[in-house]
Amino acid sequence: MLRFVDLIQNPRRFLALTGYTVDEFRALLSFFIVRFQAYVAIFTLAGKPRRNRTYSTYKNSSLPTMEDKLLFILHYLKTSPLQESHAQVFGMPQSQASQWIHLLLPLVKASLADCGELPARKREDSTLAEDEAGLFFHDGTERPINRPQDPEEQHLYYSGKQKEFTVKNNVVIDEPCKIRFLSETVEGKKNDKRLADESGYRVPQGSV
């Protein structure tokens, strides 16, 4: 069973399973706690309006600490496992894992926005062009998805190159390895340059 208190003893494994160093994790945690506490003050974990009883964590909870909750959702985002597999790693039934995923995903996204680490998704939101000229890395990231049920979507998302159904995003990363722009999600077979042209983002003049 994966737990923060155990994983923190191995910083390299911690980075591999979350995409964050321990220091980066702790920095994000402070914003995550604020978002989580604000949510459970109003709603139950099932998303229903909270009445009289305040939120408390049970001793036998599968995610007993705020660190474990953040670890749970970051590990899910980093490794993209099946919910059944993710549930097994954290010692809970799949239905409970699904509930936690749907609860924590928007909270961690909001936390990243709060600390200024959420990449721009639209050209008009990007501040790339305002930066000083520098080194930027541009790449397309293609990943598999489950076979769509709709025949038209099957045709759209099937990649002959990969021999599977895929989606793609373009990312722009600066020299310190911070993701500065993340394009919309499209079919994996779309050409990287075409997606870049459609996204319309611009790096500072004189950049490499």
What are these regions (language model features)?
Residues 1-61:
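Charged, often Cys/His-bearing segments associated with DNA-binding zinc-finger transcription factors
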Residues 17, 61-62, 75, 90-93:
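Short secondary-structure transition/capping motifs
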Residues 59-67, 159:
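Structural motif
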Residues 65-79:
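Short, amphipathic alpha-helical "recognition" segments used to contact nucleic acids or chromatin
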Residues 80-208:
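Short, well-ordered secondary-structure "scaffold" segments embedded in the functional core
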